[in-house]
Structure formats: structure tokens, C-alpha cells
Amino acid sequence: FINTIKLLIEKYREWKNKQSS
């Protein structure tokens, strides 16, 4: 469960970064 959350956060951060561009 924790692992999944970490993965989601990573993906979210990556997506956020792309949106910022």
C-alpha cells in the first residue's frame, strides 16, 4: 500500500513538472 502511494506521488510530481513546462 505505502509503495503504491509513493509511486503515485512520483507520477504526480512528474506530471506536475510536465504541466509546468
From Swiss-Prot:
It is found in: Secreted. Expressed by the venom gland. One of its GO terms (cellular component) is extracellular region. The modification Serine amide is found at residue 21. Its main location: secreted. It comes from the Eukaryota. Keywords: Amidation, Secreted, Toxin. Belongs to the cationic peptide 04 (cupiennin) family. 09 subfamily. This is Cupiennin-6d.
